[in-house]
Each structure stands twice: as C-alpha cells, then as structure tokens.
Amino acid sequence: MVKLLSGLEGSQTSLKLQLYPFDAETTIQTGATGTLDDGGELTLPAQLTYDDGTAYTGAVRVQSHYYNPAEQGFLEAAPGNMSAIGADGNIYTLESYGMYAVELSDASGNALHIPDGATAKLRFPLPANYSSVPQEIPLWSMDEASGKWIEEGVATLQDGFVEAEVAHFSWWNIDVPLNPVTVCMRLVDATGAALSGFPYKISSSDQSIAYAVGWTDADGAFCAQVAATFPSAINIVWNDELILVANIDAFSEDTDLGDILVDMGGFYSLTGKAV
C-alpha cells in the first residue's frame, strides 16, 4: 500500500489505512479472457514472462480487487491521495470512475509480467450510481516511488465496460483530471477551542466526489487539495456519520479560510447512571 501523508509544517497529523485483501482469484489461460473482482474482465496476451524474462504460457493465477469510487471508504483504501501527474507534466487531482489492483502468478506463486511490446485488455465495471460516464476517460497507474498517479493513455466506453490496454500491472485507475488548489482551515468549537484529531472529508458540494480525507492536527488545522473553480463541502465524521460543517465557494488559487466554526452542541452525549 502506498499513501501520501499531508500536513502543516511543524504539526502532528494522523493517517488512516484501510487495507483490503484480493477479493477474487481466478485462473485464466494466456491468450484468454476471465473475470475479475466485481464483474470486471481481463484478457491476457498469448505469452507472459517471469522476472528474469523467461517466457511463460499456460494457466495464470489472477488475483484482483476492485476499488469502487461510490463506496464511503474509497479514499482511505485507495493508494496515494488522488494527486496525479498528467501526460502534459501538470499536477492534477482525480475524479475516479473505478480502480483495480491486479497481480499475476503461476501455480507456484512466481510473479508473471506482460512482456515488452505486449498489452493486456482490462475492462472496468461501471459504478451503478454514476448517471453518466464519458466516452473516453484518461487512464492512470500508481507510481509507488512518488505515491502519485501517472497518466498512461485513455480508456474507452465499450459494451457496458470501460476498456483499457495496459502494459504492466500494479494499480490502474480511470479518472477525469481536475485542476487542484490547496485549501487550508482550522476547525474550532463555539468557544474557539481547536477540534484536534477530528476526521474530516472534503467533497464536491453535492457530496458525489470525495477530494480528500484525513484528521485535523493538534491545532485543529489541515490543508487539502480540492478541484479548482468548483464549490466544495467541508464535513466531519462523527459516530460513522458524515456531518456537513460548511459549504465553501470555488477558488482559483490556494486559499487559507482561517477558523471554521463547528457547532458541537448536537454531537456530544453522555450515558451512564447517576449515583
């Protein structure tokens, strides 16, 4: 798992990791098509290779996990932090339409790879609650050294799937790139006291796209990347519920919002027996 930890200089912050096992394992012959986790499909090239370049044909053990962007814990589970480097060299934040982790091995567990010059066909299922999907979506793979997504081509909408040709396997992500700005703020209660260690989530104003998740630092502060020129919603997570704190306007440049008041009156409750 690769995650990027963001925080203010000199502050202490927290990071939550949500780890998933491979949910599906299947056997696919080289040159054939098989199913992946959550209904995706994989078509292998006629030949694969071992680490040393030796050719392999035959039965391939395929393990996969699908990261559904519509699920609540998507950002915690996804590698990186949705920060990406486009083919033009610019930095983006990503709106995901689906993500796969795939590993290939032989029956003994030895890793297998796509040979140079070959590709595999990876087909992503469509998230059920997405009302529309672009005909073409940029394709991204995870660079484990930097923790950023790297643009590597285009996936296309085909027969109810989003289809891509991939030349290697790690994490693959289909996303629309958005220009990012950094928004900083400090969450405080009615007395002005810092809300330290509070889980937050920054989303689009309609809550359909999650931009960032994390925890406030010891001073109740945090900074997050959001999509430029789009309004956003600031939320905290309380008792596993997403609670809207404030809506913020669209910004075209990095912005410090200062203190954001969180009305804690309805959140705290005490239980017990008076004696």
What are these regions (language model features)?
Residues 2-7, 241-253:
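Edge beta-strands of extracellular beta-sandwich domains
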Residues 236-238:
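Conserved structural position at the C-terminal beta-strand
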Residues 39-88:
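Predominantly extracellular/luminal regions of secreted and cell-surface proteins
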Residues 42-44, 56, 92, 112, ...:
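Short, isolated positions in well-ordered beta-strands
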Residues 1-2, 6-37, 49-50, 69-70, ...:
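Proteolytic cleavage junctions
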